[in-house]
């Protein structure tokens, strides 16, 4: 009995080894692909226009625009009339030239300004500008009121009065007390021009030195005032 069961068991194991496995079940069916909503099915990479055919109408329009620009015609805006160019006023005429028209050049009016001031009357024949004749020649010009009239008159008349006035003006300020004494004027009866000139030069030199000393004293006092705290 044991021997009869053993071969049957071995034959069953051989059948399991030689038996093929069952086939796998097929995969489930996949849903169809849906296109994107923003994609346009009519436009495809194969339907793109060629570069020669692209923008043929635009090239004609660009050429027409270039022609208009070369001609210089401005493009009028829709709803507006033609553009008016501003007109400039004509330039003023050039002033007349010539030797006898010197006064007329001053009378040219500039636009935007008032009339020129009253000009003096033209000189009479034989009269030079700045040198009047007749009664005006007899009267000397008025002396200036700035305090230097005496000095100029004194220099023209020999320098005696002008130099005395200058020295007196310095002493009135309180700084001319220690100045050098004025030199005695030369004797007019001698008639020596060289002595007169030498005396005047010495006097002018002394006055100049005194003026330099006064200026230096004023500057020293000024710097001292600046150096002292207020």
Swiss-Prot record:
<dbReference type="GO" id="GO:0030430">
    <property type="term" value="C:host cell cytoplasm"/>
</dbReference>
<keyword id="KW-0244">Early protein</keyword>
<feature type="region of interest" description="Disordered">
    <location>
        <begin position="1"/>
        <end position="192"/>
    </location>
</feature>
<feature type="compositionally biased region" description="Basic and acidic residues">
    <location>
        <begin position="128"/>
        <end position="140"/>
    </location>
</feature>
<keyword id="KW-1121">Modulation of host cell cycle by virus</keyword>
<keyword id="KW-1035">Host cytoplasm</keyword>
<feature type="compositionally biased region" description="Pro residues">
    <location>
        <begin position="113"/>
        <end position="123"/>
    </location>
</feature>
<dbReference type="GO" id="GO:0039592">
    <property type="term" value="P:symbiont-mediated arrest of host cell cycle during G2/M transition"/>
</dbReference>
<comment type="similarity">
    <text>Belongs to the papillomaviridae E4 protein family.</text>
</comment>
<feature type="compositionally biased region" description="Pro residues">
    <location>
        <begin position="20"/>
        <end position="35"/>
    </location>
</feature>
<comment type="subunit">
    <text>Assembles into oligomeric complexes. Interacts with host CDK1. Interacts with host SRPK1; this interaction may favor expression of late viral transcripts. Interacts with host cytokeratin components KRT8 and KRT18.</text>
</comment>
<comment type="function">
    <text>Contributes to multiple aspects of the viral life cycle including viral genome amplification, suppression of suprabasal cell differentiation and egress of newly formed virions. Induces host cell cycle arrest at the G2 phase by associating with and preventing the nuclear entry of host CDK1/cyclin B1 complexes. Inhibits cellular DNA replication by preventing loading of host replication licensing proteins MCM2 and MCM7 onto chromatin. Within the cytoplasm, associates with host kinase SRPK1, a splicing factor regulator, and inhibits its activity.</text>
</comment>
<keyword id="KW-0945">Host-virus interaction</keyword>
<keyword id="KW-0597">Phosphoprotein</keyword>
<feature type="compositionally biased region" description="Basic and acidic residues">
    <location>
        <begin position="148"/>
        <end position="163"/>
    </location>
</feature>
<keyword id="KW-1079">Host G2/M cell cycle arrest by virus</keyword>
<keyword id="KW-1048">Host nucleus</keyword>
<feature type="compositionally biased region" description="Basic and acidic residues">
    <location>
        <begin position="50"/>
        <end position="78"/>
    </location>
</feature>
<protein>
    <recommendedName>
        <fullName>Protein E4</fullName>
    </recommendedName>
</protein>
<dbReference type="GO" id="GO:0042025">
    <property type="term" value="C:host cell nucleus"/>
</dbReference>
<feature type="compositionally biased region" description="Pro residues">
    <location>
        <begin position="87"/>
        <end position="98"/>
    </location>
</feature>
């Amino acid at each position: 009995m044991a021997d009869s069961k053993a071969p049957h068991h071995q034959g069953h194991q051989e059948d399991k080894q030689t038996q093929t496995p069952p086939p796998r079940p097929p995969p489930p069916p996949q849903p169809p692909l849906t296109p994107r909503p923003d994609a346009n099915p009519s436009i495809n990479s194969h339907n793109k226009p060629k570069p020669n055919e692209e923008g043929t109408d635009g090239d004609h329009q660009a050429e027409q625009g270039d022609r208009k620009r070369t001609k210089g015609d401005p493009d009028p805006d829709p709803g507006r009339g033609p553009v008016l160019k501003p007109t400039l006023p004509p330039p003023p005429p050039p002033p007349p030239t010539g030797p006898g028209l010197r006064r007329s050049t001053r009378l040219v009016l500039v636009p935007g300004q008032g009339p020129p001031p009253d000009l003096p009357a033209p000189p009479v024949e034989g009269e030079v500008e700045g040198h009047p004749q007749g009664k005006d020649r007899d009267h000397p010009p008025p002396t200036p009121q700035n305090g230097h009239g005496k000095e100029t008159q004194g220099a023209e008349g020999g320098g005696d009065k002008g130099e005395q006035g200058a020295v007196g003006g310095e002493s009135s300020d309180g700084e001319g007390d220690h100045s050098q004494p004025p030199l005695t004027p030369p004797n007019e009866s001698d008639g020596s021009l060289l002595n007169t000139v030498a005396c005047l030069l010495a006097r002018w030199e002394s006055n100049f030195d005194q003026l330099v000393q006064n200026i230096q004293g004023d500057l020293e006092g000024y710097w001292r005032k600046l150096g002292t705290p207020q």
